[in-house]
């Protein structure tokens, strides 16, 4: 039996890895080893067994929610006697830098596409709604990149509002991790999806400084939300490992914003990454990201090697 744990006034059903694994219904995997390699991050050794044990049951749970949502929307259209555009099921996915949000989002997108009821699944990251570096520099916010004030929240909320309203073509700005900046004139077009996954560190934050659109928050548009969690010391280690791997890959590109760090020694690289964590990412985690964890419908608790140790499902 699952145990019940009260987490900051939010009761969760806490399932161990074995309990969660036992919920899986599917007998086959809609993904192979080669496809998995293309989806996982640099230092995330996720296996097909991990996909089968953790991510397939999660996709099955999301399928239950998404199809129930679709039926409700259909019944509402019938009740009001109009052919209103279909409103997609929106999943919010939050968590710290380097915790593995992007891999989780890509895996869920791949798995959810396997159902004919919702084969069109779009993935949008909130990185595209960061202000351009030029704007951040002018406002003295480059060291606050990733903090709530570094995002164009009104634009993100307008985007989500249009998507949720069923607008047929909605554009999202594109962010380049190579240049560490918004790609001017480039957009991702969201066209009548069944499901949209919105991934970003900030998606569950309630930013009370947003005076342009009062009392409206990014999470208001979510039908289900997920928080990917791990101990901070583990996340820091993953962050350092990723930085070192990028030194030998992306940082070698002359167009990379971090090209100047490619020749740091191993000790220097670890010291630099640790400093960035302590002064920026760790501060953001404690001030803005971690406090939102218990607003999520489901928490994936990671242990070593990005393997999930337990799953917490909110009851209210």
From Swiss-Prot:
Compartment(s) where it occurs, according to its Swiss-Prot or TrEMBL record: Cytoplasm
Predominant location of this chain? cytoplasm
Query: Could you tell me which SUPFAM superfamilies the record lists for this protein?
Result: P-loop containing nucleoside triphosphate hydrolases
Name its pathway.
Answer: Cofactor biosynthesis; coenzyme A biosynthesis; CoA from (R)-pantothenate: step 1/5
Claim: Cytoplasm is one of the keywords in the record: yes
The record, for CDD domains, names: PanK
Binding of ATP, residues:
95-102
Per the UniProt entry, the signal peptide is none
Respond yes or no to whether keyword Disulfide bond is given for this record. no
* GO BP: coenzyme A biosynthetic process
EC number annotated for this UniProt entry: 2.7.1.33
Q: Which UniProt keywords apply?
A: ATP-binding, Coenzyme A biosynthesis, Cytoplasm, Kinase, Nucleotide-binding, Transferase
Instruction: Give the matching InterPro entries.
Output: P-loop_NTPase, PanK, PRK/URK
Q: Which GO terms describe its cellular component?
A: cytoplasm
**What family does this chain come from, according to its entry?**
Belongs to the prokaryotic pantothenate kinase family.
HAMAP family in the cross-refs: Pantothen_kinase_1
The entry's protein name is Pantothenate kinase
Recite the lineage of the species: Bacteria, Bacillati, Bacillota, Bacilli, Bacillales
Q: Which gene encodes it?
A: coaA
